């Protein structure tokens, strides 16, 4: 799984269409297909204000997943259990070390809809074939098999440190990671965003269609369509931080400690004036709130130095801090999601309007 090497704060990667630093710009890209070959971040919108991107399509020359078809399917004595042979497409070779079972999907040969099934055991045969024992309702010869070989990488569209950003009529057919990821940005709107596979395929993004962290203002998804993505169609949240070193009663170093780091591999930190909630892990009870008076981001050390307006408890064992200023009001209106993994909508904010959606 290349994620362990590629999805880190220090890994160097290419950016395709870099809009960093733009303001008061509308970019019309109707009819434009950004065809990616390999791992990269196709679009970056960073340190921007009042920018709208319209009509762009992001897709891949060689899809960041493998596709094959069931060529043999022999029932076992156990109900809905089969001995299966899968032949992979010519442009989808594998090796004995290729991760094949991170996240996969069986699709009906006629309808294309995913079937409820799992692989009990798997055997590599050659670079285009494997055999497996599969438990799956109604699996048959001709059904399609799709699998990804990595979870997180760079997103197709990365929005960071920006304000008043709109994506209109943008399509993402595939990405070895998430579709749209927003971080530390204010007032982001997605209008008629389509995260759907290219015609003839049944996988779009490896993981979330959209994901937003430490946002402010309003986050709006309107009349968007999400299909065959590998995780939630949207996930909106901030980060919990732990106090790692105390300088004084009001000054300390804090650090985000999730196993994979943040979703853009950028340091998360509060701004001066933000409100931090102190929460007890065992029962999620909020014990106190603090105003940030001073902050020093330390990306190389993956932590930040913070001064707050009144003393912290003598012991912070079992406690965590969350920046509740960076929780946007979320509107999800008229969107649809189907044939995907995980949840449809995952919201960890203090306010939302979710209506007229189909999942």
Name every feature range the model reports, one short phrase each.
Residues 2-26, 35-54, 62-80, 151-162, ...:
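Extracellular beta-strand-rich solenoid/capping regions of secreted or surface-exposed proteins
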Residues 24-33, 49-60, 163-173, 186-199, ...:
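Right-handed parallel beta-helix
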Residues 35-46, 166-169, 182, 211-215, ...:
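Extracellular beta-rich repeat passengers
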Residues 36, 60-62, 67-73, 85-125, ...:
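Ser/Thr/Gly-rich low-complexity blocks that favor extended beta-strand/coil architectures
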Residues 50-52, 65-80, 243-275:
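Surface beta-strand/loop "capping" patches
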Residues 114-119, 123-153, 288-289, 294-331, ...:
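Small/polar beta-strand repeat architecture
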Residues 137-147, 169, 182, 197-200:
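Extended, non-transmembrane interaction/recognition domains
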Residues 185-219, 247-262, 358-359:
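Long amphipathic alpha-helical scaffold regions
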